[in-house]
């Protein structure tokens, strides 16, 4: 007697592409600390332009932008009308916010399961295989997002700003040395640090010649002089 033919059942499955998204925000704070080069006194009334050198970009498939994109202009202030006049002030502040966003899409998968003795069993196995594949594809997309965010955070962990004095207060001059009137500063994310900017002061040279009032000839003997400068706090001339 011939053996009965066993019916075999198969089922195909297909897992569509999965998408994941992610984002983060950074802030960058800059506090100007304006001082005089030699005396270290605080300098009010200096106008400083601060601007991110790069304002937007793309990293690992995601994009970022900083706001405000343009320059911010600040003026130092904070002097107090007391004996600490020269020690207080020289302050100004500005801040920026950065946003990064990325979306990643996985590949697709498909397959076939079987044989099974019933179509119901084959369909159930196909559904299970499809669900497992979808979960893996979701993980694949999310891992890609996580990697992109990590790369972006590393790259944007500090950004450069133009830090430049545009208006010099009366009595001072621009300084072109270290921490001078024109700088490029690197600002770490999520900080609000002080950035020193120095001013030179006006300088002059005085040549004194002692002469005889009658002959007009220069007197060779030593002469002693005292030089005074005006103090804005006391309202008096003070010896230098």
Task: Show where each model-derived region lies.
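Solvent-exposed loop/turn and edge beta-strand elements of beta-rich ligand-binding domains
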Residues: 1-240
